[in-house]
Amino acid sequence: MRFVLASASPARLSVLRSAGIDPLVRVSGVDEDAVAAGLTDPTPPELVTALAAAKAEAVLPAVAAEAPDAVVVGCDSMLSAPDGEIVGKPGTPQAAAERWRKAAGRSGELLTGHAVVVLRGGEVVARTQGHLATTVRFSEPTEAELDAYIATGEPLHVAGGFTLEGFGGWFIEGVDGDPSSVLGISLPLTRKLLAEVGVSVVTLWGPPVAR
């Protein structure tokens, strides 16, 4: 059975490879704004889980033809900022700077949603989904440090405008909860969801792959 990651995230791919899974990567191309617009007053956990499910569902036709026996995992992340705002990817340097100034010296909650779909013989036989919240404690970068960080381009395209494993790690005081969820895919949550649909994660392991 193939493990299929419905995400273009290098961080998620790296986490899986270091944990013994070399997935088939298929990018969903889901319009996240359209998915969100189709929901009625979703809570943050409902939104992040719905987005993860949409990504997994979007790749099913292609995966069914290519790997008819597979487990497909979709993921989404967003930050519940210290001021209560729910934020995704900043997109612009100005938005990234504003978010960092609001978060500096405070804590936010990183929400990660996962959806798992099992295919056998090209047909869906099981689905499940869930979410996890992890507290992230932000440092207080100087203006010069913040300018330099934003200039790397890294915070523009990641949920909440920060990374734990890249340049952003210099400005994170700590994480309370599952660190892999902050990287985009929670290993404990994924294992739990796989078990719910009758798949043991150890059957998907291969030798660790260089990141």
From Swiss-Prot:
E.C. number: 3.6.1.9
Cofactor(s) required, per the database record: a divalent metal cation
GO cellular component entries: cytoplasm
Pfam families in the record: Maf
Superkingdom per UniProt: Bacteria
Principal EC category: hydrolase
Entry's family note: Belongs to the Maf family.
Protein task: Nucleoside triphosphate pyrophosphatase. May have a dual role in cell division arrest and in preventing the incorporation of modified nucleotides into cellular nucleic acids.
Listed name of the protein: Nucleoside triphosphate pyrophosphatase
Annotated source species: Saccharopolyspora erythraea (strain ATCC 11635 / DSM 40517 / JCM 4748 / NBRC 13426 / NCIMB 8594 / NRRL 2338)
